[in-house]
């Protein structure tokens, strides 16, 4: 069967049928252990309900100990054992960490930093993404693996690379420089168009030929910001090319096997919105910090962003920690019940698999203190008992696999805007993309509203409220789409430093926020960022919410051009200047926030925007800290309620539902959730028992 005859949806459907419900498992690294331990692993996996493992992520050195000398015997045994125990393999192409012999034979493939430092092997990801040597050897290995395991009964999915770009996202070597020049020539066509896009007449940076252009290496002062931005785009594309080359090799030989790779939440190096459409199913590694009081909200943002990147399709949680990680300054374990809670949160927000790094905690190596499903203490441990209980629980709700969510609120996010916002030479380096995203997402989460985090090019017609969290880079085309959305009756909530530059980091002239001025009914002349720790005093305008605390981070000189103020700045030089505004545009409403209000005030402003849009919470009347999400199937839906607090809570349902985690799935009209508790509630028409 040719690749063109099998669609991504068909590949994923086959995977879902193979797993029989939600996937459960983790990274399996049997090469670290002896035969007796491997035998125990298989027994414990069956006991815990493991259905899927990520296999051989770092196996290149074992299967190709010398050039073209492939030796699959070890993993043949492992694959045979997995198949015999009914466990599917997400088999890695093993290309995340090239073997020592390859780096020794081809030192030119090693990555180079902006200051010219060559990064040595000894860690992982020690390759230049543009290296023809690396790409050639990676594709050859992928082809050899596909040919060898094409018909193996354990093979369920291919896992290409691993967490692309988290250690080496950019390479500044001469090979990358030549590849960058080719990329620029394809993008711009002529050096004159590049000069215009990069504003090279500033500081006499004009080029007369592409051969003169280098990556933004260390320079006497700030490199050209448009050059930096394009180099980030190029670097993203170079890594994506590596993925595509391996994916295409796999599909030529195993066209019906789905292909994925895994993102790492919180990293800005690869653009999820560009990568996810290239995969059959997207995957994410998520490591919330148990020390953080709002980590469940940060995780929720990542899950909604990945679902936005997939167009609403389910995704796979390929890694999380059973308890502690090893790479923070202070590595807290997860309190009893938290691993279960955070796993179900991922499922609620679209995950069709719950997996961990890793199955058995390593005895040696850099990650030996990263927890495992089977920890150093062995199976007689709290962590393993919680893992086993969760595996059995997930197996009770196979109907969740393949279900999707739909929401009325879209938060717009763009990796290009993230990259551009955090370049140098801005009014304030304290304005950070993820923090601004959190500031807008958190009140929506607190108010119980479902959210999609989508790219500005997404179709907005199905949404009622669109949020722009300091979306610094905004093209004229995307701005026009937003304006049309509001004019047609939608509600917009935008915050400061939005719509400032175009896709080439050139300022939209005529006053800020550029192409959104008319929609918002304002015109900003100047930015006045606050100093570190400096309060920004605020008060309510007539009819506006009264802030309990000062704002922070930012203020700007907002001129009204049809908008009405809701918050006002106070204090010397700022008394009664607008700090938050509302404006009627067409049949819709556009709101603007010119500072960072305290969380309560931001929640009040968000509540007003939701009222304008007619958006209700998923489950009205929820106590603070309780999350509710609905996943919808064919003729049924499942409501998942998560108690992120340390207190028991009582939840009343608007109609009876089936408690899908309880024996015989009884009907319930309400429930009490223990601290860190979870409820999974189906519609009454679902089967009464499993």
Describe every region a protein language model picked out:
Residues 40-46, 54-118, 246-253:
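Aromatic-lined substrate-binding rim segments of carbohydrate-active enzymes
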Residues 1-54, 65, 80-81, 88, ...:
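N-terminal carbohydrate-binding accessory modules
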Residues 116-281, 285-299:
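Polysaccharide-binding and catalytic clefts of secreted carbohydrate-active enzymes
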Residues 26, 45, 53, 82, ...:
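Conserved, mostly hydrophobic/aromatic
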Residues 20-22, 49-51, 83-89, 151-156, ...:
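Short, well-ordered coil/turn segments that N-cap beta-strands
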Residues 23-33, 56-73, 120-139, 164-168, ...:
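The substrate-binding groove and active-site-proximal loops of carbohydrate-active enzymes
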Residues 33-47, 138-144, 264-275, 335-343:
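Short, acidic/polar
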Residues 210-213, 265, 276, 287-690:
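Carbohydrate-binding surfaces of carbohydrate-active enzymes
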